[in-house]
Amino acid sequence: MPYSDTPTKQTQRLFLQPDGSKALRRTESIRKYVMSPSPISKSSIDTSPEFSSTFMSRSGTEIRWKDRTIYRIGRNVTAGYPIDLIEQERQEAEHHLLRILLGYPYHGPVLDILKSSSRMNRKRILDMGTGTGIWATDMADLFPHVDVIGTDEVDIQPELVPPNCEFYISDLTKPLPYPLSSFDIIHIRFLSTRVQSYPSILSQALTLLRPNGLLLLFENFTFSPPQTVHDITPKGVQAFYDCYKRSFSSSGLKVCKLEDVVGTLRGGGDIKGDLIKVPIGHGTGRMTQLSKIHLINLKAWIESTRYTIIEGGGYTNNEFDILSQAFIDDLEKEELYTCYHSLWVKKPTNVSQNSE
């Protein structure tokens, strides 16, 4: 379905129901663009001619802050995020939770792209901002006939990976050293608050896609706070997100709005997607335990924002504790859902690109 600014009754929103089932709800409040191995080691440098030395550079720096290891997003930016084992475990737990809920590690027409991959004509996937590499390794296991590359500024990926999976360290703020039109699928997840210019990441991804390739985005755009089934956000939740948003902006980073994303993607092909709502701490059947795991994960995410809110926003530790506790209180007494935006763009076949 192509993008349109006009709300439509045909737009779909995907809900993960408290009983674990999936249901499509029709709504007029969502726009069309949000419809809803053998021993192997990780590679850190590729010596082939098409790669450049920028692979080992990165825009941010690692620091010790209180009892956490923080990666500052930019040298002149005070925002950052933890990269220690606690945060790595949180990210991987969120991946596994979403994989169980959605049934696959992806959301979108991935099989349409990968079904023609063969030994003589292997498809290629790029995972930008791969983090712990859990998504890339999962996809490599699931599609052994496809080559998967993960790239990030932080070296926290595993050493033992499937034979068709490789990881590289690179500066995401600069052009990646890949030829134009060299990937069939590019995946970007939870990167909108971890880079200085998310739209520029998207623009670069589109140039790296082959014609008929697929760009997959899975994010929480516009700092969308947890909501009730009726799209109501409790005051404690909203106060925390307002604080985080202000701190993010004060840190020298631009808050990426959904309309900015759509504007960047509009020329790349038809934009489709879903708004996925996941129950937090409530539900029946299999969702009883899964939603509780989601609640624990969300509490860990709240703590991961402490650095940005205190150092970037100028709040005190005590103020952060008050705000975060109000957030948690609302999570525990209200039936809320986390809002995830899943968007995908299929690049047209007849696209001409100029070499850089």
Q: Language-model segments: which ranges?
A:
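Fungal intrinsically disordered, low-complexity serine/threonine- and proline-rich regulatory regions
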Residues: M1-P49, S355
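A short glycine-rich, Lys/Arg-flanked "PGG" loop and its adjoining helix->strand segment in the class I
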Residues: P199-L214
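Conserved catalytic/acceptor-binding region of the Class I
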Residues: T193, L214-E303
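A short acidic, Gly/Pro-enriched loop at the edge of an enzyme's catalytic core
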Residues: L176-I185
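C-terminal lobe and adjacent flexible extensions of AdoMet/dcAdoMet transferase-like proteins
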Residues: G269-E356
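Class I SAM-dependent methyltransferase SAM/SAH-binding core
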Residues: R119-L176, S200
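A short beta-strand submotif of the Rossmann-like class I SAM-dependent methyltransferase core
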Residues: I188-L191
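Class I SAM-dependent methyltransferase Rossmann-like catalytic core
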Residues: I45-M120
